[in-house]
Amino acid sequence: MYDVSELHAARQQLHTLNLEQQAMLDNDMIGIAKVKDRVIVWRNPALERIFGYAPGTLQGRLTEEMYVDREDFLAFGRDAYAVLATGQHYRQQRRMRKVTGEIVWIDVNGVLLQGQGESLWLMQDITAMKQYQEQVEHIAFHDALTQLPNRLLLADRMTQAFALSDRTQTQVAVCYFDLNGFKPINDRYGHDMGDEVLKITGRRLLEQVRGNDTAARIGGDEFVLLLTAVKDPAEVDQALCRVMAAIEQPIDLGGGRVVRVSAAVGTALYPRDGTTSFELLRAADQAMYADKGHVSVERSL
């Protein structure tokens, strides 16, 4: 004979399990897809919402539609299915494409369904998280006022430039700038106007460098230009002439207030003057102070 109470309890547990499974499948945050031959044979509503498809329209489609381009689709297939074939899970954070063409970041987690020739994939939109990470990284490595690279990012760029220099037998120039005439402007017109002068100066520096060079603000009214792959020191002189001419252009602060600044500059070359970022910055800083003293003597005369 059957125990009716046990049978009822078993049915209740099964019903609860079905509800839990359905809740998981209907989860609005995690998209789920069953894929065979890279065609979606089943999906939950969340997957269509994540990728912007109308309800019921994603099933039966080739997954290629969800990738940035065909090359990305093929590369993912090679990498992911090679891992799945070993019986392991495959997980990656990657850029994918919504039906509108918008690019989003997706956390992709897949497993092979044994004996079915199918794979099961969980996908979650992590675009907001990625954007937040990028903002945090930007804040950590950029000057808040000018948005130029700060000392930390400059040091990293210098390390990369030194490695390139070693491979290509070229030089790296570190040019250290200190503005002349900034303090009187700051004292007379206030910090807001002083900040505007620094921002304009930063933009002018950035406009004068090549794409593989770096303009950085490392504090106060001090800036650094990192010039990479220098074959002839004359290239540095030519670049500095352009930069100094740009810095010395009048700055219109509005309300009839037009100011000018100039700069003292010191240059150090890798590997001639040092082989580390600390040594090169120190050498360029010392050369800058020598130049600043020379400028001061000229003005007093």
What does each of the following model-derived ranges do?
Residues 1-3, 67, 116-127, 283:
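PAS-family sensory domains
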Residues 191, 240-241, 255-256, 269-300:
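Catalytic-core segments of nucleotide cyclases and related cyclic-nucleotide turnover enzymes
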Residues 85-106, 117, 257-259:
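Per-ARNT-Sim (PAS) sensory domains and their PAS-associated C-terminal
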